Amino acid sequence: MKTTPLSIQTTNKLVTNYKNNDASVMKYFDYSSIHYEQERLAYLNNRTYKRQDFVKAVHKLHKKWGAPEASMEKLNKLVDEQAVAVVGGQQAGLLSGPLYSIHKVISVIQLAKEQEKKLGIPVVPIFWIAGEDHDFDEINHTYVPTTDMKMKKVKLQNKSIDAGRKSVTDLEFEKDKLREWVEDVFLSLKETDYTQDIHSLVQTVLSESDSYSEFFAKFIFQLFPDQGIVLLDSHASEIREIETDFFLEMIEHQQGISSAVKSTIDELKAEEYSISLDALDGDAHLFYHDEQLGRVLLQVDPDGMWVDKQHNMRFTVEELRSIAINSPHLLSNNVITRPMMQEKLIPTLAFVGGPGEIAYWSALKDSFHLLELKMPPIVPRISFTYIDRYTSRLLDKYNLNVSEIISTGVNDHKRRFLDEKNNDNIDEVVEEVKAQISDIHKPLRDISASMGDDIKALSESNLSYILNDVEFLRKRLNNEIRKTYAKEISEFDRMEMILRPNNGLQERIWNPIYIMNCCGVDVFTEMVNNHTFVQEEHWIIHL
């Protein structure tokens, strides 16, 4: 396995400026993404955490999920008052979801290893599974390659009426439907020496799981059995039981948090920074979980009542405090308060985030301060593109630059290739013929114009019909060229499908199953063990 660093520019100005440590953006963060360790450690050493309670809660989850010994050992290190953590997180995607979920795990593991060696204290890699999310449409599918070099969405047909209403962890886990979905995915795989083993692994993990979050966790543990990755489900009752005090703080400071977030978002947008986050002064940034209505986002109305959008529920602040104390499992965080809850629970040395997370965390600094917290340093996750040998040979065959193809695709190169093969200059000839026809036809249009509007319109339609026939011939001629070079066109399309599928990065579309099918179940562990990847870089992995 050969690795090559690659520089790819992001289109998000905020993220670019953050990576460049630009002062115009860094004012929205408490730390730089580099050289933050000593300052952050000093801060963490002055805080206390419910370490024993947290380890006990996660230990229950690990035992349920059959966590490997290495993960158990790492988890137990958090009891040490000196121990800190590197944290990342993601939704519970099927078979982990897109590749970038795996890349986050790799980033967390590698950064934890680096910092433990550098600082000489235990640094625990923690991956936070967002089981409280309810948007099932974001996790219920993957993409598979088709014979015409396209990526097709394969969606899990979950029939539950709760899909999209209840949190993913609470959603009915329809194993039969998921088995059908798994078979559909494996039908798209080319048979290799690893296919049967991977299929058996997935079926075993599926049969032993009782929720989508557990399916995700068990799968990740299989991919990283020796790396000590600690997994937790943010919606697990075991975790909720130690969050009561933190929910009470968020309830108390609701107005301040809401106003601070809205003010910062407005400021960011005024500075023309793109951030896909909206907030209103009345937003509570907490969810309530109702058996009938599912997960509902709470707001605070002008009378100080905590209500849902449709006003089906109404709570006084005292009633909500009582829920936090007696039934914390009925509450959960949204995208605004989840980072703060994470900070309350875990002594976080650094948070590993993608571009979207860096963008929305930029709105949270003042809210953190309201809860007497400092935002953790945010380290951009590592990004990868995998290139198989055949695709690599195609790049060489057509003398294409991989960075350019990843960034902009192959369409311009494919068009130039076909233009070079078009020795008869079909398009140029067609345009000349159309111009000549229009000139020859003009006397007829002039005569028609003198006879009235109806006959004038008829003459113009007549010209249009003739030119359309010429266009039809142009298409047929170009199609003949495409037939002649169908193999080459297919090769261009393959490079696009592999390197820039659906007009985006490979890691946002492809599932890790395809990389495992090429190189084995341990391919990602091999990457972590045998290679050091610089943070903030994109890397090419030559398979």
Swiss-Prot record:
GO terms for molecular function: ligase activity. Its EC number is 6.-.-.-. It is an enzyme of class 6 (ligase). InterPro entries: Bacillithiol_biosynth_BshC, CC_BshC, Rossmann-like_BshC. Keywords: Coiled coil, Ligase. Pfam families: CC_BshC (PF24850), Rossmann-like_BshC (PF10079). Residues 419-440 form a coiled coil. The keyword Nucleotide-binding does not apply. Belongs to the BshC family. Involved in bacillithiol (BSH) biosynthesis. May catalyze the last step of the pathway, the addition of cysteine to glucosamine malate (GlcN-Mal) to generate BSH. HAMAP family: BshC. This is Putative cysteine ligase BshC. It comes from Oceanobacillus iheyensis (strain DSM 14371 / CIP 107618 / JCM 11309 / KCTC 3954 / HTE831). The gene is bshC.
